[in-house]
A protein has these predicted regions:
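Active-site-adjacent beta->alpha loops and helix N-cap segments on the catalytic face
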Residues: 81-91
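Bacterial carbohydrate/catabolite-sensing allosteric modules
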Residues: 35-46, 67, 90-98, 102-298
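Negatively charged, flexible loop motifs adjacent to catalytic sites
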Residues: 55, 82-83, 104, 227
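Short beta->alpha connector loops
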Residues: 53-56, 77-82, 202
Length: 298
C-alpha cells in the first residue's frame, strides 16, 4: 500500500476511474460494469460505480463527488441530452468516454451498439412475419438510445410502405413499470397492434408480464420483441426474440480506450466505436394468425 500511495503522489493520479450508469440492477449495465472492471484491474486501476436513475440532477451531483475524489477519468452513460456534464468535467480536465449512448458534444469518445440499426432489424423481422400494425414502447425522448431506436422503427415501417401511427408510439421510463403501464394502454386501443417492439429489456419484461396477466397469448395474438436480451433467470415462456448487445465488450472497450489515453498511447483525437448487435429469434415473434381483439378473453 505505501508503494501505491507513493506512485499516486509521483504521478498525480489516483488510479481510479468512475462508471456512471442509469441503473446497475439492469443486467445490461451489470455486464458493462464487469467489462470495465476487468479491463481496469488488468492495469491496476480501481473502479467506482454510481447510479443516476436517469436523473440529470443526480448525475451532476455524482459528477461533483467524483471530481472531488479526483478520479482519472469517467465512463458516462448520459442521463439526458444536456451538455452540462461535459462542461463540468472539462472544467476540471477530467476526461470522459460516453458509453451506450450517442452524444452531439465534440471531442468526446463513444463506445456503443448501433441502436438505430438494431431496432430496424427487429422491426424488419416483424414486418417479414406479416405484421403491419406494430407498436413501440420506449424511454424518454431526452435519451439518445430511445430516440435512435424509434428512428430505426420508423425507418423500417417507412421502407415497407407502412403508414406511421403516432398512437402506437408510447414513451415512458426504461423500467418494468413503464413497460407494463404502456402495454396496458396498447391493449385498450382498437384495433390492437399485432406486435410490439420494446426498446430495452426492462420495458420488455414489464410488457410481457402485462400481456400474460391480461391473458393475451404470445405470439399467437401478439408478438413481442426486445432490444437488449433478458438474462437467463428472467425468461418466461415464450422466450423473447431479442437484439443482444455485446455489453461486456462495450464496457471493456470503453475502459481500454480511456486507460490507453491515460497511458499516453497515440490515438485519434476522437474515437467512436460502434459494435454490432446480434438478432436472436425465439418463440415470442410469430406470423399474424388472428385479428387483434379489442379486449382479452375472460
Amino acid at each position: 500500500m505505501p508503494n501505491a500511495v507513493a506512485r499516486q503522489l509521483r504521478s498525480k493520479r489516483t488510479r481510479t476511474i468512475a462508471l456512471v450508469v442509469s441503473d446497475i440492477t439492469n443486467p445490461f449495465f451489470t455486464s458493462i460494469a464487469r467489462g470495465v472492471e476487468d479491463a481496469a484491474a488488468g492495469r491496476e486501476y480501481a473502479v467506482i460505480v454510481v447510479n443516476t436513475d436517469e436523473s440529470q440532477a443526480k448525475e451532476i451531483a455524482y459528477l461533483r463527488v467524483l471530481m472531488a475524489r479526483q478520479v482519472d477519468g469517467v465512463l458516462l452513460v448520459p442521463a439526458g441530452n444536456s451538455a452540462e456534464p461535459f462542461r463540468l468535467l472539462r472544467s476540471q480536465k477530467i476526461p470522459v468516454v460516453v458509453v451506450d449512448r450517442r452524444v452531439v458534444v465534440r471531442r468526446v469518445d463513444e463506445v456503443r451498439c448501433d441502436s438505430e440499426a438494431g431496432a430496424y432489424s427487429l422491426v424488419d423481422h416483424l414486418i417479414g412475419l406479416g405484421h403491419r400494425r406494430i407498436a413501440v414502447i420506449t424511454g424518454s425522448r431526452a435519451i439518445a438510445t430511445s430516440v435512435d431506436r424509434v428512428a430505426g422503427y420508423e425507418r423500417a415501417l417507412n421502407e415497407a410502405g407502412i403508414p406511421l401511427d403516432p398512437a402506437l408510439i408510447r414513451y415512458d421510463r426504461f423500467s418494468l413499470a413503464g413497460g407494463s403501464r404502456r402495454m396496458a394502454e396498447l391493449l385498450a386501443i382498437s384495433p390492437r397492434p399485432t406486435a410490439v417492439f420494446a426498446t430495452n429489456n426492462f420495458i420488455a419484461y414489464g410488457a410481457l408480464r402485462a400481456l400474460l396477466e391480461a391473458g393475451v397469448r404470445v405470439p399467437r395474438e401478439m408478438s413481442l420483441v426486445t432490444f437488449d436480451d433478458l438474462p437467463e433467470g428472467w425468461h418466461e415462456d415464450p422466450y423473447l426474440t431479442a437484439l443482444a448487445q455485446p455489453a461486456y465488450e462495450i464496457g471493456r472497450r470503453a475502459a481500454e480506450l480511456r486507460l490507453e489515453r491515460l497511458a499516453g498511447v497515440a490515438q485519434p483525437k476522437r474515437q467512436v466505436i460502434i459494435l454490432p448487435g446480434e438478432l436472436i429469434i425465439r418463440r415470442s415473434s410469430g406470423p399474424v394468425r388472428t385479428s387483434p381483439r379489442s379486449v382479452p378473453d375472460n
